[in-house]
Amino acid sequence: MLTTPSFTLGIEEEYLLVHPETGDLVGRAPESLLPAMRSKLGDQVTREFLQCQVEVGTRVCQTLAEAREELSYLRQTVAEVASEHDLAVIASSTHPFAEFDQQMITDKSRYASLEADLQHVARRLLISGMHVHVGVEDDDARIDLMSQVTYILPHLLALSTSSPFWRSGETGLMSYRICIWDEMPRTGLPSDFESWSEYLRHVQTLVDAGIVEDASKIWWDLRPSCRFPTLEMRISDLCTTLEDALCI
């Protein structure tokens, strides 16, 4: 029997680290920064692909009010710790004038592998986003809901946009981040599947062909999480305000 989904919420956000006086991105984050953040947030804060980024993630939230409290605390704490290191944090999906080829990639095997595989396409990823996990415990229900929700993904992107500038220029687009991201393989709207088993066969075909190691390398705008029984919405820009993030 199909069980009613819990529709729990989990929100992940990626922030940019800048010098408060100039707004310039940090070339290399201070070694003490992440330990200081983790002393207050534990594993809710992690490094990201570039040294100038940090990522936070809420705990599993049962209500929107709980998500508001969690995300507010994460944003405030990250900003406070950054300030203690003479840095500031900005919530924006692109930096208005930074050059991507001047940024330093975080020393981590997963990121080194990504750069080795995708070269210049990966190096251009000076972008930040917001990912929202929604709890849907039944496998087939997760796939069915993915097909239904795909229709509204462009609307969510339009409501979240925060990246009109790129390399000191006005792009003419409200979300230039999505243009950068769509240069990556296996992105865009998800494929349509009739069942969880059909989705698993699709993943296994990619694995057998040597295209991906596992489902975590499928970067659709909406996907079944490979870590949790959730649907992961990945299309939106990083919202500049807490209220906008919660609205999305």
Predicted regions and their residues:
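Catalytic cores of large soluble enzymes that bind and process phosphate-bearing ligands
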Residues: E66, E70, S191, D244
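Terminal catalytic/cofactor-binding subdomain
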Residues: M1-V121, L126-I127, E213
